[in-house]
Amino acid sequence: MSRTAPHRRAPKRYKTPPPAPAHVVTGNEPVIEIISLDMEARGVGRTETEDGTPGKVIFVEGVLPGERVSYSTHRSKPKFEQAEVVQVLRESVMRTKPKCTYFDICGGCSMQHLDIRAQVAVKQRVLEDNLQHLAKLRPETVFRPIHGPSWGYRYRARLAVRFLPEKGGMRIGFHEKKSSYIADMKTCEVLPPHVSAMLMPLRFMVRKLSIYDRMPQLELAVGSSVTALVVRNLEPITAADEQVLRDFADEHKVQFWLQPGGPDTVTPFYPLDVQLDYTLPEYGIRMPFKPTDFTQVNHAINRVLVSRALRLLAPARTDRVLDLFCGIGNFTLPLARISKEVMGIEGSEVLTSRALANAGLNGVAGHTSFECRNLFEVTADDLRALGHFDKFLIDPPREGALAVAKALAEIARSGNGPLPKRIVYVSCAPATLARDAGLLVHEAGYRLVGAGVVNMFPHTSHVESIALFERD
């Protein structure tokens, strides 16, 4: 196999920005009461005015609702300011000591200072606020949150790589808060322990490569028995580089892949006799994947999520189910175990092919079919042409499933075409879920039976959720 880039490009030299000036505490900083958290886990408050009218909105990082803090503004606009906390004058009972040594500088996590149960409650509030404000909806039932291990859960990550001689040499990890620098992190509490322990050895290994200062990132994917690292090699690697990778792989029990170009250029390098996969034991499913395929970052939560989604969808043995944005078959294959027929539709040809292969591997090819289609442009006629499906499962990216929701609304208005009686919608962006839910309820005639959060990314502001819609 070729390990050279299909075309040469000029090496990218990474420049480091000047450090932001540190705030000098004077004791005269303004003080504010924190009311809530926004979508980025920043505290939200308003300045106090003499006549009691609402003042300017202030977004303060590192604070919690109920706290009274002094702050320093680093960006001011006519209607709001962005600020950093100087001192917490009154602490929230929800405040906890961050486990990670690097929490104050690393941008990988934003909520370690908030108790994990309170994190889930905050995310549930974000979900409900989006549904109410954007779609004028309240779920009939608030589902019990899905949560699990909050440390060592991150089985996928993109680790930035930079050579910074003025900052001490090689760095590998996440970016600093509000900076393009990479945090000087020697361990990471949200990565699996064996990966966290590799961060420093990885620095030394990359420094030995000929492309050490022209390598932008390492892509991490952890499977059930294999840990893969994708080297983004914008230039060909040398024979000496290859030996460095082999030696590291043997010592640390990892598999290296190379990516000289776009995602389609990713190929395994060494060793070649192992395979990435994850399992769904409840359904007897083994799911092989490539390290650049989309899979959920949190394997434990994904297993619970699949189980919850299938229980809510409750397919009968006679049901035909449509799985939209099916990926490599994360929901499709378990559904095939308990329903008559499942059709998976995915926008990526690569993922569609992987789903088809996984169906064959798991013995459910006779109950599944797959199609590659752009679901961001799907129409009512497209859905009609697919025929009748009793139930839908929708698991879109952050952009949501607007075209699907519009198509269902058009079918409902026209009365021409079948509609599923039940829809389970798995979302990774509450704003687009709310938008699509508004169409499904107000225009397509569905009820929002329930919704709840899925804490897929503990200690971050990311809100994943699941919702159930039914049509009488």
Curated annotation (Swiss-Prot):
> Which Pfam families does the annotation name?
tRNA_U5-meth_tr
Instruction: Show the active-site residues.
Output: C428
Q: Write down the chemical reaction(s) this protein catalyses.
A: uridine(1939) in 23S rRNA + S-adenosyl-L-methionine = 5-methyluridine(1939) in 23S rRNA + S-adenosyl-L-homocysteine + H(+)
Main EC class the enzyme belongs to:
transferase
Q: Could you tell me where the Basic residues compositional bias lies? A: 1-15
Q: Which residues form the TRAM domain?
A: 23-87
The molecule here is called 23S rRNA (uracil(1939)-C(5))-methyltransferase RlmD
The major lineage groups are: Bacteria, Pseudomonadati, Pseudomonadota, Betaproteobacteria, Burkholderiales
The UniProt gene name for this protein comes to: rlmD
